[in-house]
Design a protein with these regions (language model features):
Chain A
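Asp-box/WD-like beta-propeller blade repeats and closely related beta-sheet repeat scaffolds
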Residues: 114, 123, 128, 140-181, ...
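Beta-propeller domain segments
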Residues: 21-66, 175, 192-195, 201, ...
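Beta-rich catalytic cores
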Residues: 80, 98, 113, 120-123, ...
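A short loop-to-beta-strand structural motif that recurs across blades of beta-propeller domains
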Residues: 101-104, 141-143, 205-207, 256, ...
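Short loop/turn segments immediately following the C-termini of beta-strands
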Residues: 96-97, 139-141, 147, 191-193, ...
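Surface loop/turn motifs at the tips and blade-to-blade linkers of beta-strand repeat domains
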Residues: 73-78, 115-120, 161-170, 218-222, ...
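Conserved beta-propeller blade signature
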Residues: 91-94, 133-136, 185-189, 237-241, ...
Length: 403, 197
């Protein structure tokens, strides 16, 4: 008996010793998980021009779309334009992560007017519009603004749908995407609190809340950070984009596109990446077989953000129910890729294939910065044209088709 | 030879990118708009007042980002908030282009000998160099710290520690929580002295 006690006491002592040793300060979230071999790497994220950049100084003529399509600037001067939501009366609402405002773009006979409608919000990245109300997902809560389209100059007070979503003020991926499902529930992500860390029970997930009751449910787990989702118009299945971890090299792991077909799947983070690549640290005692694989690998560090199924009537018939994905573009890669819109064709069995749809932002894959603009979200307009946002410059572009 | 050519081509591209960026916002327009700034920030943005930050040589995006945050009320200061309230986006980009184009002339100040090595260690321990760069000269929206005015640096660090200084992504507030008063003394002395080197 005695030797056992001694062992217990000794190990307790060792634990205390370990805690007494001053720990290294945690690095900023984007540097977290960087291996010693990459300590000299100068790769870094790209920061948007918050005051925007004028179209006049940008090479917009470099943007390329397939034959028959046309791309043009639709509105500018919208700081850090990110998520897009379409009002019943045609107002385009535009969110951001860092500017604390929500903007509205009103089309007045070919002229677009930009208004600041909401101010002082906490990372209001997620927005969605339904039945006259704008819902906003901030860092810590989701709110509702009723009848806002008639009151853009004097918006109503928010009504809280759900609160206390960020009790620990988590670092890392603290911004949220927001969408309304066919079930009328609000779907949102809670990102991982760093590059590669063990999430708590609510983090690295997609959740949903019933706006009528406030009841929360988990939709998917093991999702490092999703900043775009939509439902297949026919199957009604949820599809979403996901960002893989950083600092595993130029080609690994892929960012991914996922499909939720049944139950509450776990897609593997932090144990397994892209369905088949165990994490060097967290994957040691787990198997990728435990987790649901992605529907499609999109490319390493390509940063897929907003995605929508095309349900408009303007584009040729073969585009119907295809997904447009906005690729914000890689930073954690020595040779950059992305900064584009991709077209993903999916069949009803969930098979997916990807091809470029809009390119031209990437000008030099080795330069810093390598691009002059970055797509964030896509939105199908009532006439079937496609809007997309560029947070780097604060610009919205419109893609249309004519035979 | 091939490698040399490739390198030459790369630097030509870099030059082009730089000049097109400078052309984007208007340095001369910025110089005119910046006249009012000199009262506090010094001639050409080189401050001689320990409480006022120098703007000369800052990355353009760092200037524009802070002006934007002041204008939107996300960062508040009794002197700066009213100055920024009526700036247009073009004003902010012009001012940023101008100040970033000016050669900084930091005060001839050196850190106390005991703080020089200790300060450098702290900038590694607290990961300052990860975002502000190995020489603490900033990048993109991250300000240059090297040779910045000491009292200004102290006020920002103490503000981040007290969670009262505006912080977009929480990184500075988070790291400042671990700073002791002594750490702040050493860091301020070390960083403010980097301009003289």
């Amino acid at each position: 008996m005695r030797p056992l006690i001694a062992v217990v006491v000794l190990s307790a002592f060792a634990t205390v010793q370990a805690q007494d040793k001053p720990a290294a300060e945690p690095p900023p979230p984007w540097q977290q998980g960087k291996p010693a071999a990459m300590s000299e790497s100068t790769l870094h994220p790209f920061f948007p021009h918050l005051a925007g950049r004028s179209v006049k100084e940008l090479p917009v003529e470099k943007l390329k779309v397939p034959a028959g399509f046309k791309v043009e600037v639709w509105a500018e001067g919208i700081p850090e334009a990110r998520s897009l939501a379409l009002g019943d009366k045609g107002t385009v609402f535009v969110s951001n992560r860092l500017s604390k405002n929500v903007y509205a773009v009103v089309d007045k006979g070919g002229q677009r007017e930009v208004k600041t409608v909401l101010k002082g919000l906490n990372a209001p990245n997620g927005i969605v519009f339904k039945n006259g109300s704008l819902y906003v997902a901030e860092r810590d809560r989701i709110t509702r603004y009723d009848g806002i389209e008639d009151r853009l100059d004097n918006p109503p007070e928010p009504k809280v749908v759900v609160d206390n979503l960020d009790p620990q003020k988590q670092p890392g991926h603290f911004w949220k995407y927001l969408a309304i499902g066919p079930d009328g529930k609000l779907y949102f992500n809670i990102g991982a609190p760093g590059n590669i860390v063990m999430p708590n029970y609510m983090q690295a997930s997609i959740m949903r809340v019933d706006p009528a009751t406030g009841v929360l449910e988990t939709v998917a787990l093991g999702v490092r950070n999703s900043v775009g989702f939509d439902w297949h118009p026919k199957t009604k299945e949820l599809w979403f984009t996901n960002h893989g971890r950083d600092w595993l090299g130029d080609e690994s792991p892929n960012d991914t596109l996922h499909r939720v077909s049944k139950g509450v799947p776990n897609f593997g983070y932090p144990f397994c990446h892209q369905g088949d690549t165990p994490d060097p640290e967290y994957g040691k005692s787990r198997s990728c077989k435990e987790f649901t694989p992605p529907a499609l690998k999109l490319g390493a560090h390509i940063a897929p953000l907003g995605m929508r199924f095309y349900n408009g009537k303007m584009f040729p018939a073969e585009y119907r129910n295809n997904i447009f994905v906005a690729m914000h573009g890689s930073w954690n890669r020595t040779t950059k890729q992305g900064y584009s819109l991709m077209r993903v064709k999916v069949d009803e069995k969930g098979h997916a294939k990807m091809e470029p749809f809009l390119t031209g932002f990437l000008t030099d894959e080795k330069a810093d910065p390598p691009m002059w603009g970055r797509p964030v979200d896509v939105l199908v307009m009532k006439d079937g044209s496609l809007l997309f946002s560029d947070d780097y410059n604060g610009i919205l572009y419109r893609i249309s088709y004519a035979k | 030879m091939r490698r040399v050519l490739r390198r030459a081509a790369a630097s030509a591209v870099a030059l082009f990118v730089f000049s097109s960026a400078a052309w984007a916002a208007d340095v001369e327009a910025g110089r005119n708009k910046a006249q009012v700034c000199a009262a506090c920030h010094g001639p050409e943005g080189n401050s001689a007042n320990p409480a006022m930050p120098s703007l000369a040589g800052q990355p353009a995006q760092a200037i524009a980002t802070q002006l934007f945050q002041f204008r939107e009320g996300n960062r508040k200061n009794p002197q700066m908030s009213p100055m920024a309230a009526n700036l247009s986006n073009a004003d902010m980009n012009d001012l940023a282009a101008y100040f970033s184009s000016v050669q900084p002339t930091p005060p001839k100040r050196r850190a106390a000998p005991q703080n020089a090595a200790a300060g450098q260690d702290l900038t590694k321990k607290f990961h300052c160099v990860q975002c502000h760069g190995p020489a603490l000269r900033g990048q993109q929206h991250i300000p240059s710290l090297a040779g910045q005015q000491a009292d200004y640096l102290r006020a920002q660090l103490e503000g981040f520690k007290a969670s009262s200084r505006a912080d977009m992504d929480g990184n500075m507030t988070s790291v400042a929580q671990e700073l002791t008063d002594k750490d702040i003394d050493v860091l301020v002395d070390y960083i403010a002295g980097l301009g003289a080197q």
